[in-house]
From Swiss-Prot:
Component of the ubiquinol-cytochrome c reductase complex (complex III or cytochrome b-c1 complex), which is a respiratory chain that generates an electrochemical potential coupled to ATP synthesis. Keywords: Cell membrane, Electron transport, Heme, Iron, Membrane, Metal-binding, Respiratory chain, Transmembrane, Transmembrane helix, Transport. GO terms for cellular component: plasma membrane; respiratory chain complex III. It is a multi-pass membrane protein. Heme 1 (or BL or b562) is low-potential and absorbs at about 562 nm, and heme 2 (or BH or b566) is high-potential and absorbs at about 566 nm. Heme b b566 binds at H108, H209. This is Cytochrome b. GO terms for molecular function: metal ion binding; ubiquinol-cytochrome-c reductase activity. Its main location: membrane. SUPFAM superfamilies: a domain/subunit of cytochrome bc1 complex (Ubiquinol-cytochrome c reductase), Transmembrane di-heme cytochromes. Belongs to the cytochrome b family. Heme b b562 binds at H94, H195. The chain crosses the membrane at residues 44-64, 97-117, 124-144, 163-183, 191-211, 245-265, 303-323, 338-358, 368-388.
Length: 405
């Protein structure tokens, strides 16, 4: 039974009686009952929130000095780097913040896959997380176009052209995206407007994601629900301190890239102004799109490649029903655990192959890796759930500790 806080400050008490945001914050962020056995992989959810805030804040400052015009966009970015006070810092924080954002979100997702956080009753929580990923991808792609370098221009041309593979309406969709018959100033204006809008949508979906989390509570490494107060501890101070430690490590890694390797994740060709008459030797997207780009190229047919690429993400929406096992955590599923690590290696291999040229032997290896990606979800996961014999589950979250004691 939750007991509202007693406010010693009369002003706070007066305000909270009329708009109880402080009481809600106290309930959901201070005394919120979290499983007592969460490991450091559960830090990545809060780190994703921090990364999102960094991206929104730096993006707002960059937008103040950016010019969304094909004749001035590249120069405006260079002016931000040279003439705007701390503009170089804002740009490098924003560019590297995108990579950090995707890193923590991908770790967050693979943690969910390993510990079965997509299983009932958290299906909607999982769906909202996938919507967040899709919004991140759309936002990142449009942001990559804004500097209007060679990779920006040709990346926009290649990716938007994929929609032409859609029967009947494909060409009309491409024309709508371009605002004309080629990637030009209307395209840049559209992408800048949407790049500014999508983070607000992202923030709203993150709020729903957290709401769903607090309704059905957190999963945990054992994959079993809390049986009572002995299985939980207050979020503050235990997990706020733990999250603060993780944040310190995250910021050290983030600052290393911002100050010592700001272009580590970037493409040298994007420091060349966009030129529609000169095609780069090797067009590649940002690293966080590479696995899906590899899947796109694995299928010779254009429409088939597009369907495979989008299917690689959309298949995750039905994963709660593809996994037939009653046990959530891979800790107690030895066979599934082995296949999980093979799947992780397959995803890393696809990322590597996505950066390689479309030639042998990379094409054949990419096709095999793509086949395994879909086999993992459509064949291996259901079959393992049916035939695997899991290890015995603990009686409660606290029982492994109390039994040893």
């Amino acid at each position: 039974m939750y007991t509202p806080p007693r406010w010693n400050n009369k002003a706070l008490k007066w305000f909270d009686e009329r708009l109880p945001v402080l009481t809600v914050a106290h309930k959901e962020l201070v005394v919120y009952p979290a499983p007592r056995n969460l490991n450091y992989f559960w830090n990545f959810g809060s780190l994703a929130g921090i990364a999102m805030i960094i991206m929104i804040a730096t993006g707002i400052f960059l937008a103040m000095s950016y010019t969304a015009h094909v004749d001035h966009a590249f120069d405006s970015v260079e002016r931000i780097m040279r003439d705007v006070n701390y503009g170089w810092l804002m740009r490098y924080m924003h560019a590297n913040g995108a990579s950090m954002f995707f890193i923590v979100v991908y770790v967050h997702m693979f943690r969910g896959l390993y510990y079965g956080s997509y299983k009932p009753p958290r299906e909607v929580l999982w769906w909202l997380g996938l919507v967040i990923l899709l919004l991140m991808m759309a936002t990142a792609f449009m942001g990559y176009v804004l500097p209007w370098g060679q990779m920006s221009f040709w990346g926009a041309t290649v990716i938007t052209n994929l929609f032409s593979a859609i029967p009947v309406v494909g060409d009309d969709i491409v024309t709508l995206l371009w605002g004309g018959f080629s990637v030009d100033n209307p395209t840049l204006n559209r992408f800048f407007s949407l790049h500014y809008l999508f983070p607000m949508l992202l923030f709203a979906v993150v709020f729903l994601h957290m709401w769903a989390l607090h309704v059905k509570k957190s999963n945990n490494p054992l994959g079993i629900d809390a049986k009572g107060p002995f299985d939980t501890i207050p979020f503050h101070p235990y997990y706020t301190v733990k999250d603060a430690f993780g944040l310190g490590i995250f910021l050290m890694v983030f600052c290393f890239f911002v100050f010592f390797a700001p272009n580590f994740f970037g493409e040298p060709d994007n420091y060349i102004p966009a030129n529609p008459m000169v095609t780069p030797t090797h067009i590649v997207p940002e690293w966080y799109f590479l696995p899906f780009y590899a899947i796109l190229r694995a299928v010779p047919d254009k429409l088939g490649g597009v369907l495979a690429m989008f299917g690689a993400i959309l298949i995750l929406f039905v994963l709660p029903w593809l996994d037939t096992s009653k046990v959530r955590s891979a800790t107690f599923r030895p066979v599934f655990k082995g296949f999980f690590w093979v799947f992780l290696a397959d995803c890393l291999l696809l990322g590597y192959l996505g950066a390689m040229p479309a030639e042998e032997p990379y094409v054949t290896i990419t096709q095999l890796a793509t086949i395994y990606y879909f086999l993992h979800f459509l064949v291996i996961t259901p079959l393992v759930g049916w035939f695997e014999k899991p290890k015995p589950l603990p009686v409660s979250i606290s029982s492994p500790v109390t039994t040893q004691a």
